[in-house]
């Protein structure tokens, strides 16, 4: 830690300014009030598109960084309000329209539902049989599982949460108005990164985790222990009363009584004194390090989860005391940056990270780019953990929920990562000043961009040719009836030896490199089969030639996505083709009528193209996951202990040819969605077709030029004039950029909704 002389500290001073800027609906009610040109109202139909494009582009409203910062800050509260309203809706559906109590009583036979369709023209057919006499639409969001984990035992508690979330939404809206219109932070408050780090690390993440650990220990632990005992058929006794159902479980506030908790976890009876005396072992019964899964629920041990949150809290509270604020001790982010000079051989940047601190504290786009890339990656990591280390009770045997959560977190991650590239490019165009980045690391990367992009392009060609080449070879050999010459586990075997090594290393860790763990980190890593209610919750995942091949397709598609996005960022300001690109802005269709062959070079166009490859890449990821799990993990356990998998282990043989992917995965698993009419999954059949239409509709925007439509519009306007019904607002064709934006939006919406219908209709029937 850098200990500095006392004078390096700064006196605390007010970082907030009283503002007299009343929130008036007269202003808000005027469309385009934020832009002088838009405020005049529409003359042509282009106005409404520009309104959408610029409403949230605060940079375009004002160049005052403090004003932009305040608007972003205020908008965050608005965003939180929307999130609380959305949460309230989820809680309300659970309280009012769900079979939550029925599911709690028998989670392995009752399916979760929180929506009942009203009969108007026959759509009550969508209310499927959920078990225990309840008919509704099956939900796949994992809400019931997470609510049980929180310790919620009744619909009444969900209704209280629904009301509480609305109250929070009101508070957030109030805060958003207050901190912009009444009392707004000054620019230096937004740029005080050390204070922000301390508060976010120690407060938000540290104390947040600690308070959550408190909830887990005092509410979740007792409730889940009692619920697990009921589900195992061995109910526990509290104060002489047998807890035989969820209704018998004491309410959360009753667990304030330490004696009640101590009957379940004696360690809690030792109170706080054991903590201060160093006798931490006393807490070993409720802060555990077991590893593996709870055999009753197929989920991580709640005592492990509580321990995890205590540990996270300690780490982040310590981390939140590392940065120098008003006292003269701790790290300075600026000094850390400027202390990094780069490796003289590998990366000679004489000025290291000089200038980056200023860039990151004056460019919100640069800050957002880093955060989106990190959060997107984190979302994709969460997707992997949902099945490898299922945290919530019975979620691992609810296969529709498992596919739903994996797919959701993968898509979200992809969109956030593309967003990271978008904002990095905007930062380069709008906020980057070359004079402030001479020979620092960013400047050196830009100078080396040709080498970086050409090498990355070579990697993409190599990966694409070889990974796809393996499939082409296999299809050819299978077509010619030569299975002995195919790449497969039986013929020419290519084993993923590094992945298998990692699996073995994890499996061997418990009791050796992790001496205190009782079981491995995940059953997926060469563990054992965990069955709950006769269904597989987790099992070791065998990896072979088929996995090796599709993994390299993943490597190929991810690298192409990175190539497009990184090229957009590195060439956002200039290129050999268009040296003055920075003057043309973030989005432009072509470099003027005088220069042909300069279309799709703007940074925006790279984001546009990157989205297609992101979609392409992640479609294969979710298809791989869905098929692999159904083939090799999920299924029912027979009386002799053997497992009957959903697709009978066909992945290893079928996934090694393109024809196999089409025939044995896409076509075979589309049976349910195509045959869904007349059943409770028929909505997915209609959605499957409707989403295909939306996807196809996008091609109309992507495959045609603006001039075609402008010509058509002018003839239609002529006809209107003839009939004396000409509109006051002049119709205009979409601009080239607007057409691409509409096209990619429908392409992604159609593609994702098609996949949603395909997955759901299949897994709800067979899972």
From Swiss-Prot:
Enzyme category, top tier: oxidoreductase
Residues noted as binding chlorophyll a' in the record, renumbered to the chain: 692
Enzyme Commission number: 1.97.1.12
Family affiliation: Belongs to the PsaA/PsaB family.
HAMAP family: PSI_PsaA
PANTHER family xref list: OUTER MEMBRANE PROTEIN, OMPA-RELATED (PTHR30128), PHOTOSYSTEM I P700 CHLOROPHYLL A APOPROTEIN A1-RELATED (PTHR30128:SF19)
Protein name (Swiss-Prot/TrEMBL): Photosystem I P700 chlorophyll a apoprotein A1
Organism: Synechococcus sp. (strain CC9902)
Gene from which this protein is expressed: psaA
